[in-house]
């Protein structure tokens, strides 16, 4: 019988990150929550669709709340205490995602709206006729 060899692997050390940035992209169809460190390296992300909501339920404020809670609880292992929140988009899950991040236990330092606003740039698409 062959001798079994035991391979020692290095244990991965988790970094300690005290403050980070929560990027909330709230579109009309979905809400994406990404939590990064200060340099922009992604630590965890979650969407309304990945949280189990499908179809028209993805774009509700409750789905955004569940996605933000899921992302916030996953990053607690890094030792994160405070978050800067950057909100992008006009969707219905904007405020509820920020509120649920503060309910998880993070100290929110500032909230920035980074939605791009054109200074009369491209022509918008034509109006829908239903």
Swiss-Prot record:
Transmembrane segments: none annotated. It comes from the Bacteria. The keyword Cytoplasm does not apply. Pfam families: Ribosomal_S11. Keywords: Ribonucleoprotein, Ribosomal protein, RNA-binding, rRNA-binding. GO terms for biological process: translation. One of its GO terms (cellular component) is ribonucleoprotein complex. The keyword Nucleotidyltransferase does not apply. GO terms for molecular function: rRNA binding; structural constituent of ribosome. Belongs to the universal ribosomal protein uS11 family. Located on the platform of the 30S subunit, it bridges several disparate RNA helices of the 16S rRNA. Forms part of the Shine-Dalgarno cleft in the 70S ribosome. Part of the 30S ribosomal subunit. Interacts with proteins S7 and S18. Binds to IF-3. This is Small ribosomal subunit protein uS11. It comes from Xylella fastidiosa (strain M12). The lineage of its organism: Bacteria, Pseudomonadati, Pseudomonadota, Gammaproteobacteria, Lysobacterales. The gene is rpsK.
């Amino acid at each position: 019988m062959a001798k079994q060899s035991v391979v020692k692997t290095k244990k991965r050390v988790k970094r300690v990150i005290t403050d980070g940035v929560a990027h909330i992209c709230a579109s009309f169809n979905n809400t994406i929550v990404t939590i990064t460190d200060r340099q922009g390296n992604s630590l965890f992300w979650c969407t309304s669709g990945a949280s189990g909501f499908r179809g028209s339920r993805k774009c509700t404020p409750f789905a955004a709340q569940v996605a933000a809670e899921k992302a916030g609880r996953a990053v607690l292992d890094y030792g994160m205490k405070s978050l800067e929140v950057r909100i992008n988009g006009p969707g219905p899950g904007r405020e509820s995602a920020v509120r649920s991040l503060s309910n998880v236990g993070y100290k929110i330092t500032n909230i920035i709206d980074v939605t791009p606003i054109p200074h009369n740039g491209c022509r918008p698409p034509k109006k829908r006729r239903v």
